[in-house]
């Protein structure tokens, strides 16, 4: 959803999964090259699904993660906003977690749990400042009717590519 609003604001959108608005699919090599390419400061948004597949905390210290940390370290200088998701935030390497400004924990709740009729779901996002700090008490609630416009923007069952270790001896 946030990536769509960035697109409407004129930012270039890069994603490791398909979305229904104009974007460029990026690979792990694209991320690794950002820290060494000519300075490009046009505003960009990177959308990353299943971030721990690439930023895996269990590989911390390996060459791949060191290079990926170069990407996260350069993101502010290159005007790149990174939006990512994962089911297990503790599996994400610290290089990405350390630059996280906000964390949203999401859940769905029925509007009326006592009504026997089917009720739309409401999406509730609790906003945290930084990585796993105390909630600010600000809860953002989005009715299902509002969220429906975003449902068709991507396929939640689309598999994302894992990081494939190269055979160059690292």
Which residues are covered by each model-predicted region?
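Conserved P-loop
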Residues: 1-37
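Serine/threonine-rich low-complexity intrinsically disordered regions
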Residues: 3-4, 27, 38, 107, ...
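Structural motif
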Residues: 14, 45-49, 83
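Detector for Asparagine
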Residues: 16-18, 42, 63-65, 107, ...
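Conserved nucleotide-sensing/catalytic segment adjacent to the nucleotide-binding pocket
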Residues: 22-78
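A conserved mid-domain beta-alpha-beta active-site/ligand-binding segment of alpha/beta enzyme cores
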Residues: 117-170
């Amino acid at each position: 959803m946030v990536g769509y609003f960035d697109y409407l604001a004129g930012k270039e959108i890069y994603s490791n999964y398909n979305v229904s608005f104009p974007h460029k699919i990026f690979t792990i090599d694209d991320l690794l090259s950002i820290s060494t390419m000519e300075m490009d400061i046009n505003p960009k948004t990177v959308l990353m699904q299943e971030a721990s597949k690439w930023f895996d905390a269990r590989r911390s210290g390996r060459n791949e993660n060191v290079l990926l940390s170069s990407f996260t370290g350069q993101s502010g200088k290159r005007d790149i906003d990174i939006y990512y998701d994962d089911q297990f935030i503790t599996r994400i390497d610290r290089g990405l977690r350390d630059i996280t400004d906000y964390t949203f924990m999401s859940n769905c709740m029925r509007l009326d749990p006592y009504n026997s009729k089917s009720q739309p779901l409401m999406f509730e996002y609790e906003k945290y400042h930084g990585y796993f700090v105390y909630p600010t008490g600000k809860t953002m609630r989005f009715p299902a009717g509002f969220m429906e416009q975003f449902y068709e923007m991507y396929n939640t069952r689309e598999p994302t590519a894992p990081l494939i270790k190269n055979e160059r001896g690292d």
